[in-house]
């Protein structure tokens, strides 16, 4: 986290050739608002797709007021409510719609044990939480983001990608480590193929 917090726009400039050549760029709100803004502003020049994870309620405030340059926004209910200044009683669907109205191209709104609401301006989908023998929640949110992006990059639909991310989060919940030691594409593919729910 310290490395992300110390990242500057100058650092982005130094590595711009690599960044600009990417199909996707992932940033989270551990970086400064200035770095997030630079990533968003340069998206149209470099033609990468930008995915952003809000990380926490306080850090979600680093998101820009308009989300038009964010192709995939990962955010939980508390972060969304705080960012939007919404009532904590707002439904996941209402929060997701409000984030889409702020310009996000797609939203992945996590709701803990109640699953995920995801979609774009045309439709929202609810993905139920995948049952897991919970050992530790550490790393589960990161796993959901990683699994979702992995499948989006492979060409899956958003709902299919989020389902893969939810499966990866469930696998992560079942270990005491933030990254499961036996994690592999084959393990995740097997879990998805078995329809583990």
Where are these regions (language model features)?
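Amphipathic, non-transmembrane alpha-helical secondary structure
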Residues: 13-20, 37, 41, 64, ...
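Active-site glycine-rich loop that binds ribose-phosphate moieties when present
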Residues: 5-15, 34, 53-61
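Short, acidic/turn-prone active-site loops that include or flank metal/cofactor-
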Residues: 1-5, 54-57, 78-80, 130-133
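Conserved phosphate-binding/catalytic region of the ribokinase-like
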Residues: 90-197
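Active-site-adjacent beta->alpha loops and helix N-cap segments on the catalytic face
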Residues: 31-37
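Conserved phosphate/ATP/ADP-binding segment of small-molecule kinases
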Residues: 37-40, 44-49, 54-124
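Acidic active-site catalytic centers that drive phospho-/nucleotidyl reactions
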Residues: 28, 53, 79, 136, ...
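Conserved phosphate-binding/catalytic loop of the ribokinase/pfkB sugar-kinase fold
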Residues: 1-24, 29
């Amino acid at each position: 986290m310290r490395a992300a917090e110390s990242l500057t726009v100058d650092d982005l400039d130094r590595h711009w050739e690599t960044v600009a050549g990417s199909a996707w760029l992932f940033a989270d709100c551990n970086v400064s608002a200035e770095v997030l803004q630079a990533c968003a502003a340069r998206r149209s020049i470099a033609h990468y797709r930008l995915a952003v994870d809000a990380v926490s309620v306080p850090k979600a405030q680093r998101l820009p007021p308009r989300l038009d340059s964010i192709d995939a926004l990962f955010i939980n209910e508390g972060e969304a409510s705080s960012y939007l200044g919404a009532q904590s009683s707002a439904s996941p669907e209402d929060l997701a719609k409000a984030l889409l109205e702020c310009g996000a191209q797609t939203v992945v709104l996590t709701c803990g044990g109640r699953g995920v609401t995801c979609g774009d301006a045309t439709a929202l989908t609810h993905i139920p939480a995948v049952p897991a023998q919970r050992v530790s929640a550490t790393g589960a949110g990161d796993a959901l983001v990683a699994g979702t992006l992995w499948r989006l990059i492979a060409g899956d639909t958003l709902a299919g990608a989020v389902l893969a991310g939810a499966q990866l989060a469930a696998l992560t919940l079942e270990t005491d480590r933030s990254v499961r030691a036996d994690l592999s594409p084959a393990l995740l593919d097997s879990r998805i193929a078995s329809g583990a729910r």
